[in-house]
Structure formats: C-alpha cells, structure tokens
Amino acid sequence: MKLWKTASRFLPLSFLTLFLTGCLGEENLTALDPKGPQAQWIYDNMILSIIVMALVSIVVFAIFFIILAKYRRKPGDDEIPKQVHGNTALEITWTVIPIILLVILAVPTITGTFMFADKDPDPEVGDNTVYIKVTGHQFWWQFDYENEGFTAGQDVYIPVGEKVIFELHAQDVLHSFWVPALGGKIDTVPGITNHMWLEADEPGVFKGKCAELCGPSHALMDFKLIALERDEYDAWVEGMSAEVEEPTETLANQGRQVFEENSCIGCHAVGGTGTAAGPAFTNFGEREVIAGYLENNDENLEAWIRDPQSLKQGNVMPAYPDMSEEDMEALIAYLRSLKVME
Amino acid sequence: MATQKQEKSVIWDWLTTVDHKKIAIMYLIAGTLFFVKAGVMALFMRIQLMYPEMNFLSGQTFNEFITMHGTIMLFLAATPLLFAFMNYVIPLQIGARDVAFPFVNALGFWIFFFGGLLLSLSWFFGGGPDAGWTAYVPLSSRDYGGLGIDFYVLGLQVSGIGTLISAINFLVTIVNMRAPGMTMMRLPLFVWTSFISSTLILFAFTPLAAGLALLMLDRLFEAQYFIPSMGGNVVLWQHIFWIFGHPEVYILVLPAFGIISEVIPAFSRKRLFGYTAMVFATMIIAFLGFMVWAHHMFTVGMGPVANSIFAVATMTIAVPTGIKIFNWLFTMWGGKITFNTAMLFASSFVPTFVLGGVTGVMLAMAPVDYLYHDTYFVVAHFHYIIVGGIVLSLFAGLFYWYPKMFGHMLNETLGKLFFWVFYIGFHLTFFVQHLLGLMGMPRRVYTYLGDQGLDAFNFISTIGTFFMSAGVILLVINVIYSAFKGERVTVADPWDARTLEWATPTPVPEYNFAQTPQVRSLDPLFYEKIHGDGTMKPAEPVTDIHMPNGSILPFIMSIGLFFAGFGLIMLNMDNPIINPWIVAIGGLALTFGCMFVRSIKEDHGYHIPAEQVKADLAELKKGGN
Ligand code: HEM
Ligand SMILES: [Cu+2]
C-alpha cells in the first residue's frame, strides 16, 4: 500500500508506456515502420539496444523505488544510520555487468558499420546497379543519373528490391540525405564525396528530409523517393532520356515561349542534364509537390512564381511579380504538360 | 599598508570586489539572467512548433533562436551557474580563506560577463548568429553567415578567456590552499569534480580558442581554412569544435555530479558510498570524454574504421557512469532520508539521468545513429542530460547552499511545488521528442507539415514547456518571498550536514575561517560531531588575517577586451561610425595598460587585526553559534 502511494507520485512517468502503444506516425515517413532491409536492420538493432537499456533502467528504477519506500526518515528519528565505506564485491558487479552488456551491443555496431559502408554493386543486377549522384542545394535536391545521361530534381526514382547506390555531394553548405522509412542518413559535404546505399522492399512514395541545418528554409528541404517495379522504372528512365517533344497544345506551346523569354530555362533544364542552379523540370507535371513541400496546384504554382521568397525564405530563385495573367496561364499549362510517364 | 578598509558605496564595492563569495553571487545573478533569456527563447521556439506550419517565428528568426538558446545555455547560463557554486563553496569546503588568485577570479568573472554581453549585442546589429551553437562551416563562413556569426566568434572568444582563467584559478586553489589534514583523498566530491572539470576546461577551451581564431581569420581576413573551393576543409572545423564540444558536456556535468554527491549524503545521513571509486570514475569519465569527440560526426563520412572505433570508445563511458549511479543509489540505501526540496531534486536526478544515459549508449551504436543523428531523438537525449542532469542538480545545489549564501531559507512548500511542476513539465516536454525523432522529425526545423504524424507529440511537448516555465516562475516567487518572509538562518549548520562549509558562521565573515581548521577525516564536520564536540579544531592561533584589496582593474580590463572584440566585428560592418581598428587597438591598449598598472603598482592588501577576529569570535559565542 505504502509502496503504491509512493509509486503513484511518479505516475507521470508511466506515460513511458506510450512508447509501447504504437503511435507510429505517418506511413512512409516514420522509421518505426521500416520498408527496406537497411531500415529493418536499424530497427532491429534499435529494439535490441532498447531491451538492454530497459533492463538497466528497470534495475535502477526498482532500487530507487525501494529506497523511496523504505528509507524515509521518520519525524523525531535522530538515529544515525550505519556509515558504510563501500562494498568491493558490489562495485565489481556493477562494473562487470555493464561491460558484458556493452559487448552485446558492440558486435552488431561494428558489423553494421561495415555493412552500410559497402558500396559494391548489387550482386543480383551487376552492371545494371543504379547509381545516383545526389547534390544538396539550398534548399532543394538534384539527382543526376549520370550513366543514363539525365537529371531529375526533387523526386528521385529507384527500382524496388535492388540495392541502389547514392553518391553524395553538396553545392553550397552541408546537407544530409535522409529517407527515414528506408534507412539512415549521410551528410552531403562540400568538397567531399560520400556514398550510401538504400533498398526499398515494396513500391511506394517515401518521404525524404534534409537533416543538417542549412539555412532559413532547412525545414522545407523535403523530397520524395519513389520506388517502382523494375519495368516501370525502366519506362521512367526511357521517358527521362528521350528527346523533348514540342507540346501539342497551343497554350502550352505559348507557355514554352514564356519559359524561354523569362530565362526560366537558364536555371531549370527540360530534358537532358540540368544546370546546377535550379531543379530540372523534365517530369514536372508528374510531381506531387512544388518546392519540396507545397501541394502542386495552379494557385500554389502561381504564388510560387510571383514570390518564391515568401514561401521559402532565403532561396535563390528570382521573383516574377509582374508577369501578365495570360503569360502565367500559358506558363502553367506548359509546366503541366511536362510528363514522361503515360 | 592600510589596516582598515575604507567605506565605499555599494556599487563600487561590487564592481571592485575580489571576495570569492561576492563573485559567486555575481555569477549566480548573471547566470540566472542569461538562463531566463535563453529559456524565453526556448519557449518561443516551442510555441512556434506547437502546431504545424505556424507563423510565429520565421525560419531565419528561429535559426537565430536555436543558436542563441544553445550557446547561451551552455556558455552563459550553465557554466556561470556552476562557477557560482564552485566559487562560493570550494574555498569553504577545503578550509581556505579565498581562492589562490582573488584578482584573477574577479577578472575571470568580468571577462566572462562582457564576452556574454558582446554576444548578446548581435540583436542590435542585424540579427543573432544563425548557424547553430556548433557553427558548422560553410553555413558560418563569410559567404553564408551574417554579421551575427562574428558576434558569436568574438563573444565566445572573449568569454572563453574568462572561463579559462577562472578554471586555472580553481586548479591552483585546490592544489595549494587546502587546510591542514585536507588530503586529496579527503576532498569533498564537489571539490574533486570541480577540479577535474577545471582540468577539462584547460584542455578543451584551448582548442576552442584556436578554432574560433581560425574561423575569425576566415571571416574577417579572408583566410581559407574552412573553404573547400580554396583548398580548405569543412570537416576540420567539426573536429576542432567537437574536441572542445564533447568535453564541454563533461565540464558541465561533472560538477553537477559533485553537487549530487554532496546533497545525497547530507540528507541520507550517510557517507558517500564508494568514495574512492567515485573519484576514479570521475577521472576515467573525464579522460574518455576526450577520446570520443567524433561520435558527433558518424554521418559526415569518416569511414567504417573510424566510426567503429569511436562507437566502441563511446560505449565504454557508460561503465564509470554506471558505477556512479549505483554508488548514489547505495548511498541512499539504508539511510534516513529527508525529502526536502534539495533532496527531491538530487534524488530525482538519478533515474532521470539514467534515462539520458541509456539513450546515449543507443546513440553510440554508429549504424543506428545514422537514423538518430540530427533528429529530435538527439534533442531529447541531450536535454535529458542537460536539463535532467545539470539543471536538476543546479536547483538541488541552490536549495542546499542558499541558506549559507544568503542567510535565509527558501520556502519549502513553494520549493516542492516548483519541483513537481518543473519535473512533470520536463518529462512531458522531452520524453515524446524521442518518438518525434524516430518518426522522422529532423532537429533545427522551424516548422513541419501537418498530417505527417508529428502533430500530437509536438503539441504535448510544447505544453510541457509551459509547465517548466511555470516552475521557474514559482522559483522566482520563492526567491522574492523568502527574501522578505523566509526563515532567517544564523546557525552555522541548518541541515546537520557533513562538510566544512557548514562549519563557518552564517553570514560567512569575509575571512571565512577565523582560524584555519584542522581536518581529521573525510566529511570533517560529521567526524567532529561523532568524535569531537561538533566544532572544528583550529590548526593555528588567532592571528592577523591578510586580505587582498579590491580593484577596479579587472572591470576595466574586461571592457578593454570587449572593445577589442567589438572593433574586430566592426571590420565586417557596412558603415562603421569610426575606424574599427581604432576601437580594436584602443580596447587592447586599455587592457594591456591595466596589466601594466597592475604590474608596477605596489598593493600589499590589508590586515584584519587579531583583536577584531577575537571580537568576532566572542560575538558568535554569545549568539550561541
Ligand atoms: C527550459 C527548457 C528547455 C527547452 C524547452 C528547450 C528547448 C529547446 C529547443 C526547442 C531547441 C531547438 C531544437 C532543435 O534543434 O530543433 C533546443 C536546442 C538546444 N538546447 Fe534547449 N531547451 C531547454 C533547456 C536547455 C538547457 C538548460 C540547455 C543547456 C544548458 C539547453 C541546451 C540546448 C542546446 C545546446 C541546443 C542545441 C542548439 C542548436 O541546435 O544549435 N537547452 N532547446
Ligand atoms: Cu539542407
């Protein structure tokens, strides 16, 4: 009874149990619902470490609550408790047991570190292993498929069930490339080339984030990783590598002129490899979001073109506040027509 | 040589004081002001994150707030608050009349203070630094970082000098000024941990000073140490920073351990369990603290060999830390525990710190850290260490030493209320952040989109912050209330404590001990209570006591350094009103001029005559002290 009374004072702590109730967050963002072998490995070892650490914590908490319950000084009790110096046997025990626990964690730590650093091609697909060069910019992502000869901006496509190798670069400041549901993150560092690999078990859209402070709009530096079955992926690659055709619609055709006259094209390539100044637009019409985070509708698109700074503080795109309504309409129609998949 | 101090105005007295007890109180006040400032910033940041896509702070302002919050909390709040206790308590606990170099002690305070002021001035010159408290290049380089970073670089450079010379002072004091019989293995644990922490400052603040100097050269004079396009190396900064930055955590947490190791025995009425093991565990923690800096950099691409080595090295720190945890628990075990406010904070520290520690081991698993790194999981981890460890023990120390420092108690009812509100708020704020991190929330983000599963926990976290703020307000009310209505303390030893500071009368006379005490054991006061008459045996007859004179020079020298730093910052301003070099060189000239004056001016201090000391003693006897 007494014990319970004491314990109940610590009731706030019992929301520890929240941890076990499965509030997992959004599918395809959270790392608590892994969707690839690397993420699964991380998840399993995280659980292993939580179990070990929970054991340690439970021992400490148990001793602590016993103390709370048993060793309170009663009013008027002036007795001086026995003054103990220490206890060598006990002290050796709580030195040796943690060492054993740490060894249990150290072994997967080392094997995992080497496994993740492996940048050899996928043995299953050999020469067809997908290599993607990632470049972090303030505040967007560029994906160069160098072997295939084209560039994608903001959305990166990979085939399902294959180890995909990423080569990481940074254009300006540090960024960090992270797709939580698929695995860990590695920084993109100016002047240094890093590598990592990821694999997706199933098709889907996985959210990616920049994890290293990179300026005022760091929070908005999101991207999408889209995993497709191999044949769909091949179709996408083909579409991205194809010559860009004239838009068939007149409005869109007009829009293309606007795009060229306002030198949008100076920063945003359509087809082929992009310049480094802005995201490539080859498949813009298929994007779910603008600028990494805004829903891709006409209203947002117009707002973005007229004043990108107010939507993403500190980015380098110039504003076009005075573009006429007709031009804007045509431009949007043109951007909508940029698709590579049927 | 004068025999009597002249009367001075109160302000002049504080500006010129070299008394360690007054300097301690100045550290306490300055540290508290900075703590509140950084706390308000935290509150604002949490309000911004209460709902998705809030528009309370802009991305730029938010980044300035994280930078200033982190920098201020570590350098200008936690450090000076610990220094406050170290300054007050160390000389008393070792039976000394003052620190080894009272003048340097005052200098250390004023340099720290003006350095902090310089940093804070950034708000008036176009915004605070915005590259995080770690100031990673290139974001903090000339090309990407604004003027605020110059304030960061020079403000920290100046205040770091203050911290460094104070640490040297503590080292010399502890080595040289101990009372007869106070051997190293009888030092109270707070003195031990302060000693080791000061050693860490010596070895960690020097690389920081070097790093800041290099960054300053890059920013002001277009050197290229950290600019990759010019052959510099970005990662170099991270190594230099963390060689300082990792030990910095131990610099703060070791004295916090020391406070806990004082408060728990006092209120359990037991000696510290495993004293020797505690001392050596502290040393091992400090040593390992220097070996593991690169665990902050698992994701920069150091390669698997380096990552494995640093991962395993990091894990080993858990062993000595575990020893400490169990020794604290077994100090309480079998004791007769009084749960007043100080003890509530000290005892609740133990399980809370364990929660922060176990996530530390989790983070040390490098490949799993690829997930945790730079997410809210890390934010949760280090706030469990910093708030759950350092801040809880600061509060424990405050309630414990307050009667000695200010001559009255803090109100216990308000104190306990404060404890519960703050403690609940703390867990509410930071526990859910572990989950936010795993659910994909990076740290240092000023906003997040709705419907990503992050909304609920962010909301809970912000509510927790309101509780913590309410707690701190309760503390402020307590301090004000107790100043007027609090129970006066004139007895030497209101807690029935064990160490030497409680052998001095309250209020503590300027000379601390009328006669240097003879120390016969660990926990000397307790020993005398059991084996003697409960008072310390004097180790010397009553004689004239030699005291140092106050001096305004430390204050002026610090102003000199302030202007030296400000002048250099002006080099990067668009339209400085006067030539920056005049300000910079003028400031340095002021400082060096003062040093020259100090060197040639003869100042032998003054004596308190033996008769007066005797009179004081007689007065105390009458008061039944
Ligand atoms: C009153 C309770 C506190 C609250 C609510 C709080 C809140 C926050 C928040 C919201 C952040 C930004 C997190 C991010 O990186 O996205 C932060 C960062 C930080 N806090 Fe606290 N904090 C508190 C107390 C402290 C204390 C007492 C210290 C140190 C003594 C501290 C040290 C830091 C540091 C070093 C950072 C990292 C700053 C950076 O990223 O550059 N905090 N805190
Ligand atoms: Cu970024």
Curated annotation (Swiss-Prot), chain A:
The parts of the chain that form a coiled coil are: none
Instruction: Please give the residue ranges for the topological domain Extracellular.
Output: 23-50, 109-342
Cytochrome c domain residues are: 250-342
Q: Which InterPro entries match?
A: CcO_II, CcO_II-like_C, Copper_CuA, Cupredoxin, CuRO_CcO_Caa3_II, Cyt_c-like_dom, Cyt_c-like_dom_sf, Cyt_c_oxidase_su2
Spans within the Cytoplasmic topological domain: 70-89
Q: Where is the lipid attached (N-palmitoyl cysteine)?
A: C23
Region Cytochrome c oxidase subunit II: list its residue ranges: 23-249
Give me the residues that bind heme c, please. C264, C267, H268, M317
- Which reactions are catalysed by this chain? 4 Fe(II)-[cytochrome c] + O2 + 8 H(+)(in) = 4 Fe(III)-[cytochrome c] + 2 H2O + 4 H(+)(out)
Give the record's keywords alphabetically: Cell membrane, Copper, Electron transport, Heme, Iron, Lipoprotein, Membrane, Metal-binding, Palmitate, Respiratory chain, Signal, Translocase, Transmembrane, Transmembrane helix, Transport
Q: How does it sit in the membrane?
A: Multi-pass membrane protein
- Please list which residues make up the signal peptide: 1-22
Name of this chain's protein: Cytochrome c oxidase subunit 2
UniProt organism field? Alkalihalophilus pseudofirmus (strain ATCC BAA-2126 / JCM 17055 / OF4) (Bacillus pseudofirmus)
The gene designation is: ctaC
UniProtKB/Swiss-Prot annotation, chain B:
A molecular function GO annotation: heme binding
Keywords assigned by UniProt, alphabetized: Cell membrane, Copper, Electron transport, Heme, Iron, Membrane, Metal-binding, Respiratory chain, Translocase, Transmembrane, Transmembrane helix, Transport
The UniProt feature for the cross-link 1'-histidyl-3'-tyrosine (His-Tyr) gives its location as H246-Y250
Binding, Fe(II)-heme a: H69, H383
Q: What membrane topology does this protein have?
A: Multi-pass membrane protein
Give its localization. Cell membrane
The record's section on Pfam families has:
COX1
Q: Which SUPFAM superfamilies match?
A: Cytochrome c oxidase subunit I-like (SSF81442)
Please classify the protein's predominant subcellular localization into one broad category.
membrane
> For Cu cation, which residues are the binding ones?
H246, Y250, H295, H296
Put simply, this protein is called Cytochrome c oxidase subunit 1
UniProt lineage: Bacteria, Bacillati, Bacillota, Bacilli, Bacillales
